[in-house]
């Protein structure tokens, strides 16, 4: 019989956790930002609020978003008018939607990642599922496992209600699992549906309207493992380090509360300032062991939040305009998809690097940073290392 010491000596991986495949998915319903103020005030029966509509139009114009995707269509909203009220009793209606749609959209992204990976799904050993869109038991991790037909013995982790920083959280967890379990292959899925937080406008809560102007639906999926078999697996990025921190003096900066009216968001105006004020410390903690101090020598994958956050971070660090190009492209094409955003940006980064003829998956650079920002304020930082591209 094995001793506890022998069990503890189970083999661990030799190399760093590596992203081996990426998949993304959105609902088919595209919403164009230029048309959204008219649409939003019409479907919520708020067209009489003319001054508020003009404020909302300015929010949309400043968002730097061209297009978003949403599960909610005009037909669905007509059938469920309680979603269109500002504080309508609606949690059951919202839950009925997201409990099925979150894993379904997650499956679409996962299928693409598994196809790119090219290995049998029976080799998946762990599943990390993440969403801020509703909550249920058994969870979306269970539903995803059933939808994909994964092994009953797959080890599952479910993250609910973490918010926008969680795209970094799932990478940190996947890193620990891959590096501490030899031959582990971790399926990571972030799936977000705004049906949980869509609501009509009110002058009394402009921060709620900011969310209505920014958020979109999407799901991202990764396959993560250490010591890839280079004859059948294609590394995209390695994860060298991952950490989480709470920013000082940020209590109440971003809050979300799940209530009978759905998920409500509240944010302070100085969120961009709080993040930009503290980002240098986060970077120094992560990169001083590597010897990187020029932040323009990194490739950047930053949760977009909104354009004000990106602008202030860019100014604070003296970043060249092109450093946040991948992040801004995703914000423009998809909006803020909460936890899924950074997975879309990873996908954009490796594809853009290939299109541009770069020598690595990180725009020709070796080292990069992935940032997730979210409630409390919490910051997730992941140090990435690119891999060579055979252009």
UniProtKB/Swiss-Prot annotation:
Q: Please state the Enzyme Commission number of this protein.
A: 2.3.1.74
Its pathway, per UniProt, is: Secondary metabolite biosynthesis; flavonoid biosynthesis
State the function annotated in the UniProt record.
Answer: The primary product of this enzyme is 4,2',4',6'-tetrahydroxychalcone (also termed naringenin-chalcone or chalcone) which can under specific conditions spontaneously isomerize into naringenin.
Give the originating organism.
Dianthus caryophyllus
What UniProt keywords are attached to this protein's entry?
A: Acyltransferase, Flavonoid biosynthesis, Transferase
Q: Which reaction does it catalyse?
A: (E)-4-coumaroyl-CoA + 3 malonyl-CoA + 3 H(+) = 2',4,4',6'-tetrahydroxychalcone + 3 CO2 + 4 CoA
Q: What is this protein called?
A: Chalcone synthase
- CDD domains according to UniProt: CHS_like
What SUPFAM superfamilies does UniProt report for this protein, alphabetically? Thiolase-like
**Molecular function in Gene Ontology:** naringenin-chalcone synthase activity
Q: Which PROSITE patterns match?
A: CHALCONE_SYNTH (PS00441)
One GO BP annotation of this record: polyketide biosynthetic process
- UniProt lineage: Eukaryota, Viridiplantae, Streptophyta, Embryophyta, Tracheophyta
* Active site residues per record: 164
Which family is this sequence assigned to?
Belongs to the thiolase-like superfamily. Chalcone/stilbene synthases family.
